[in-house]
Amino acid sequence: GKSLLANCFMEECGLNTVAVRRDKGGDAFINSIAQAFAKAKKEAPAILFLDDMDKFANEDDSRCDAPEYVAVQAGIDDVKESDVFVIATVNEIRKLPDSLCRSGRFDRKIGVWAPTAADAEAIIAHYLSGKRVSDDINMKDLTKMMSYHSCAELETILNEAAIRAAFARKDSIGMEDMVGTVLKQQYGASEDVPLNSEGAVKKTALHEAGHLVACEILSPGSVGFASLLRCGGFVHNCNVLPNSCEAIVALAGKAAVEMQYPGQLAEGCGRDIKRAVNCIREAAANVGKMGFSLLDVESDRSVCMSESLNVRSEAVVQAELERCYNRAKSILSRNELFLEKITEAFIEKKTLLYSNIQRIRSATVKDSTEIAQETVSQYHNEDEDLDEARKESIRR
């Protein structure tokens, strides 16, 4: 996106342009930087374009005095009195020396952020406009299923889908090609579920359905893609949830299996539990959600957590884990039909798109406003109970 924006700018200006990219190393590259500035000065009015400038040097972040950056600074200073306009693209501006980024060398900084959902939909439509696509392409599903950080990433996926369709000797790109490409490119998923017993597949489907249902109830419309076509399966959440909700969603897979199979402990939940613990600890450390009793006030310079703080922290983390697990079970029990239908859909289709999920949700879940009210009411009482549990843990 950054290089594309710069190229469009240079094309619209209609001036002579000189581009510098790191295509060689050592002294040869440093010399090419000096030569590029000299050429731009000679051909003025001109634009000098430094592409991916943060990759000009291989020094670590603490060494910003690399000779490549010194050469750029010297070049900018040399063309100051000439009609040479210098622009650059960078991915990590923190890697550049402050002296290079200050006013007088680079006066304007323009942030180019990752595409929003609306941006991604427009970008996908643009790239597909020159390709033959089938009628089953659903733009909303396409946008929701992808994790996108740049235009180039979206373009790569769409080109790979076109190659896949051509390899299969199809006349057009279909939704199947898109789904298969996204699974492979972004999730590292094989296209066939490993041969497991029917019971194992059902438990995996139930586990992922638990995550999905909890996520959809806490944040309606947030799940854009989910599949069993990877070891353990996955659920792609399009929205960022608060840490407390993330912890509930993380434990909902375990809750779903243990509710369906009473007396059995769900296997393979270690990663989910670790994720929930991390969410709880982050909420306690960063925003003080668990109260000031978990803040280490003995020394603001202490490197390690004090023993007393560690005892208090672990007690509250365990209590919070229990609360989140119980909230997950409560959500799933109140949305049993939704959980059942999602599990069945997982077993049948293996991969669920946004439209599949929303179709099942609308048929099985009551109005989200009503759910939200019920949730707030029920969780208020649970929070009061937890406060007492925390106080008792701290007293102990």
Question: PLM features: residue spans?
Answer:
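Walker A/P-loop NTP-binding motif of AAA+ ATPase domains
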Residues: 1-143
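Residue-level signature of catalytic and energy-coupling elements of molecular machines
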Residues: 10, 51, 72, 106, ...
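Generic recognition of well-ordered alpha-helical segments
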Residues: 35-38, 74, 122, 126, ...
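Activation segment
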Residues: 57-59, 97, 182, 213, ...
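Short, function-defining helix-loop hinge/capping sites that tune catalysis or transport
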Residues: 59-60, 98, 158, 215-219, ...
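Conserved C-terminal "switch" segment of AAA+ ATPases
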Residues: 85, 98, 112-177, 253-258, ...
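Active-site scaffold of zinc-dependent metalloenzymes
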Residues: 163, 176-196, 228-230
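Soluble catalytic regions of large protease machineries
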Residues: 200-206, 212-396
